[in-house]
């Protein structure tokens, strides 16, 4: 499975094309829209969420509620487009109109300046329109398709906020994937620890008053994954590496870790490695999951646990020092409509990109023209690994 996305933040629409789905996978617009709505929720979101109520339009690859095996095209219209038709016009406009909403003061921490240098743009809007986190709309739409495929194969995905600003949530032990899903959905900040929810909301409110932004850490878990996805034989076939790339590709994400992550550096090996046991009813399992479900770049049958760190959003209502690219004089950076934090929403995006990589790995290992054939292949493989 592969995909491509297109579209600008204030253009007419966002588009995604997914290729490589088997025929016969049940899929509806409603399932995708449900995930899009989750992305637009979360405490701390800005004014655009009141403007955009994202709805997907499927224009190819699905008939009567099932995939056809041909490319699937997803389109999400930008409701705010009517206010940007001249600024974002595809056709040439008079020089005077080009200056409307032109951006010449790059924002520190954003793609503005380097993107302008790279592509020789004298209007940095040409950079920020595509580098905007609005693109994650389509990553979530694609992730919704991936989640549907995984759910049909008894693989569940859940995400939550682990850290917001300087506030760290206590994560209850032994929760099922479904329990994590339910608890995070009940929280305005998608946290599993009710004792810190109000503190997080207060921090978000104060940060907004200060004209500042805050980042955090999100965690995604994937349960029911069979052992053996990915491979150790080449560096670029390791699934944990692919997931790490996907996580860091999310706007404003700067790092990823698996299991107990960087804490491994502070422990001896005897307190890191997950001991192997076997049971007739379940087959091979581990007594712990410090490695986050991976050994040698392959899934080992334990739940995948991955964390991503999101930096504070670089668009500040009290902008930092910058330089006008026309005059080279010091100026305060440009201000665009933005959020004080998007960490709760980012947990949904992180779920989506992780689900997409796991779905791609499943399709690679159990390559089938029809989804029914794929389900049978997965069933046989699970039985094989249990009795290995």
Swiss-Prot record:
NCBIfam families (alphabetical): aroC, PRK05382.1
Pathway: Metabolic intermediate biosynthesis; chorismate biosynthesis; chorismate from D-erythrose 4-phosphate and phosphoenolpyruvate: step 7/7
Alphabetically ordered keywords of this record: Amino-acid biosynthesis, Aromatic amino acid biosynthesis, FAD, Flavoprotein, FMN, Lyase, NADP
EC number(s) from the headed UniProt entry: 4.2.3.5
Pfam families in alphabetical order: Chorismate_synt
Lineage of the species this protein comes from: Bacteria, Bacillati, Bacillota, Bacilli, Lactobacillales
Biased composition (Basic residues): 98-108
Domain of life: Bacteria
Full protein name: Chorismate synthase
Enzyme class: lyase
């Amino acid at each position: 499975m592969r995909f491509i996305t297109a579209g600008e933040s204030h253009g007419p629409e966002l588009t995604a094309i997914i290729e490589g789905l088997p025929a016969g996978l049940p899929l509806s617009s409603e399932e995708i829209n449900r995930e899009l709505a989750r992305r637009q929720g979360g405490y701390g979101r800005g004014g655009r969420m009141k403007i955009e109520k994202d709805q997907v339009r499927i224009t190819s690859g699905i008939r009567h509620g099932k995939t056809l095996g041909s490319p699937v095209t997803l389109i999400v219209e930008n409701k705010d487009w009517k206010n940007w038709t001249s600024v974002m016009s595809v056709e040439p406009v008079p020089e005077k109109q080009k200056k409307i909403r032109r951006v010449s003061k790059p924002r520190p921490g954003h793609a503005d300046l380097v993107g302008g240098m790279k592509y020789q743009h004298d209007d940095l809007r040409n950079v920020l329109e595509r580098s905007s986190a609005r693109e994650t709309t389509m990553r979530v739409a694609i992730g919704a398709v991936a989640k549907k495929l995984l759910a049909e194969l008894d693989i569940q995905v859940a995400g939550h906020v682990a850290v917001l600003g300087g506030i760290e949530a206590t994560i209850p032990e032994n929760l099922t994937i479904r329990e994590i899903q339910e608890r995070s959905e009940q929280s305005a900040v998608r946290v599993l620890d009710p004792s810190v929810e109000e503190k997080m909301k207060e921090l978000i409110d104060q940060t907004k008053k200060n004209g500042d932004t805050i980042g955090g850490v999100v965690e995604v878990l994937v349960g029911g994954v069979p052992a053996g996805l990915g491979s150790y034989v080449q560096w670029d076939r390791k699934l944990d590496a692919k997931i790490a790339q996907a996580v860091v590709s999310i706007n404003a994400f700067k790092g990823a870790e698996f299991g107990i992550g960087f804490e491994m550096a502070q422990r001896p090996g005897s307190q890191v490695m997950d001991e192997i046991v076997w049971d007739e009813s379940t087959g091979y399992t581990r007594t712990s999951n410090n490695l986050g479900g991976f050994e040698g770049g392959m899934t080992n049958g334990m739940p995948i646990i991955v964390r991503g760190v999101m930096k504070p959003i670089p668009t500040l209502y009290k902008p930092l020092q910058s330089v006008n690219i026309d005059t080279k004089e010091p100026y305060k950076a440009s201000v665009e409509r933005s959020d004080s934090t998007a960490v709760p929403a980012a947990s949904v995006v992180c779920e989506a990109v992780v689900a997409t990589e796991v779905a791609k790995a499943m399709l690679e290992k159990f390559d089938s023209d029809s989804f029914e054939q794929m389900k049978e292949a997965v069933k046989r493989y699970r039985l094989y690994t249990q009795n290995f």
